[in-house]
Amino acid sequence: PFCLDCSSFSRSGEDMEPELRSSSAPKVLVDHHLNPERDSFGVVFSETEVSSTCELLFRIIKEMPDVEGDLARLPMECLESLMTGMTTDTNNFANSVFPGTLNMASELMAAGVDRDRILSCLYHNYRENRLRLMGYLLDRNLEITPEGTAFMILDRSIQKRFDFRQ
């Protein structure tokens, strides 16, 4: 199995973790978080000085023999997915942005990725239930500790009530 953006099996969820651990298939990790669970994987691509796992994956894919730096050899869906992942992990370039992040965005746009369309799909197309959920969470579920930490709990009953979809 390939584990992307998941520095340890425990981050994969209680149902998936035992399956991943018991799998006899080679295990590959591609991640940008600190302290990956290296011993559980046969191959580890780990770099913390990148914006996202998508940025690290972009670097890996560009060096593959069938690509050799030529993004035109990749399907547009792949390029769009890489741009989408990098955009969401950086909160639209608001955090964890490095020079390589901007280079990646530039290369993807030069290869034909329509960043404006991706932004529109990510940030301007909400179902009514999603807006209602956001309002509910802010109004009824937002907790702020005395230290100033804010959090919300989105349990299964709330997910069901608002037809939550990822």
Predicted regions and their residues:
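Short charge-dense sequence patches
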Residues: 1-13, 50-58, 84-88, 114-127
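Active-site cofactor/cluster-binding pocket
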Residues: 1-43
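A short secondary-structure junction signal
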Residues: 12-15, 39-42, 57, 97-98, ...
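A generic "cationic amphipathic patch" detector
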Residues: 14-15, 70, 118, 131
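Short, surface-exposed, polar/charged, turn-prone segments marking secondary-structure boundaries
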Residues: 28-33, 55-58, 113-114, 136, ...
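Short alpha-helices
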Residues: 32-106
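Hydrophobic helix-and-loop "lid/oligomerization" segment in the mid-to-C-terminal part
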Residues: 83, 88-166
